[in-house]
Amino acid sequence: MKTLSERLNHALQLTGVTQSELARRIGIKQQSISQICSGKSARSRYTMQIAEALRVNAHWLATGDGEIGLGVGNVEVGPDIKGRIPLINWVQAGDWTEIAEGFAHEDAEEWREVTGKAHEGCFALRVKGDSMENPSGKKSIPEGAVIVVDPELPYSSGSLVVARLDDSKEATFKQLVIDGEQKYLKPLNPQYPAIPINGNCTIIGVVRQAIIDFW
């Protein structure tokens, strides 16, 4: 099978999952799945989520190499799904305290299933830029990664946080550093300077998880 369209249609047929059910599982519109199945979209950024939802080999689905791997490997024994949370933009994140209670389903860019300690009170953001990408450190979050943010989790020095400076409409993603009475928002990338914060910043939430999609 040479195309993503052929492989996805084959996987849907074998698993008995409909396009609408697959779209619901990964929190996107059915139209997006339909475009892949019809061949209108030769690639998809949702390939990893589709593979997880169908319990097939993600590498096979993306490239055609290897075996389909129905219900095997880490897909079969993956962590329990705890709920679905909205992937929002950085302006929405900056106003999350005000908009969270009345947030409408269609206001999200997409809805993502979450695992582990995340819960339905969390939200997700797609990382922009390379300020949190550390070329030499163990902790590094690249551009394009999806972070799961928990507004209810207490923060401390060293926490990765989403915050909004008083003079900005957008939220920002940094590491919180507390040194005595001084507080800073510190990028993990040493090429960027730390930002002093002392009463001019709101911590919106603590990052629980980072998810990296390879396709």
From Swiss-Prot:
Domain HTH cro/C1-type: from-to ranges: 8-61
Organism: Providencia rettgeri
DNA-binding region of this protein: 19-38
PROSITE patterns for the chain: HTH_CROC1 (PS50943)
Mitochondrion among keywords: no
Keywords, ordered alphabetically: DNA-binding, Repressor, Transcription, Transcription regulation
Repressor listed as a keyword: yes
Gene Ontology terms for molecular function: DNA binding
PANTHER family, alphabetized: LEXA REPRESSOR, LEXA REPRESSOR-RELATED
Function field: May control the expression of the integrase and inhibit excision of the mobile element R391, and regulate the expression of other genes as well.
Protein name: HTH-type transcriptional regulator for conjugative element R391
CDD domains: HTH_XRE, S24_LexA-like
SUPFAM superfamilies named among the record's database cross-references: lambda repressor-like DNA-binding domains, LexA/Signal peptidase
